[in-house]
Design a protein with these regions (language model features):
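Hydrophobic/aromatic residues located in beta-strands of well-ordered beta-sheets
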Residues: 30, 89-90
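Short glycine-aspartate micro-motif
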Residues: 8, 88-89
């Protein structure tokens, strides 16, 4: 069975909750994005994972947006061309 790519954008309380719920599933590849350097580095050290500040490109899988509602429009303006139409955005 092919693993599903799960991309979590935002590593605050909501992003961390998704991580906690998904991390034991061996059928998932988890990727993490957070602009705030301190939050990103603390999360990476605490959970022994690799994080990135930004999405370069997403061609498949699921993108879970864990960002504040007032930042949604800015996110889509900045990253819509980097996300393939086949990516499920939640």
């Amino acid at each position: 069975m092919k693993k599903i790519d799960i991309n979590i954008l935002g590593l605050g309380n909501l992003g961390t909750a998704f991580f906690e719920g998904l991390r034991k599933n061996k059928n998932l590849n988890l990727y993490f994005y957070e602009e705030n350097e301190k939050i990103r580095n603390d999360f990476a050290k605490l959970h022994d994972v690799i994080t990135s500040p930004h999405i370069n490109t997403l061609d498949s899988g699921v993108l879970i947006l864990c960002i504040k509602p007032q930042n949604i429009n800015n996110f889509f303006e900045s990253f819509s061309k980097k996300i393939n139409k086949d990516v499920l955005i939640c």
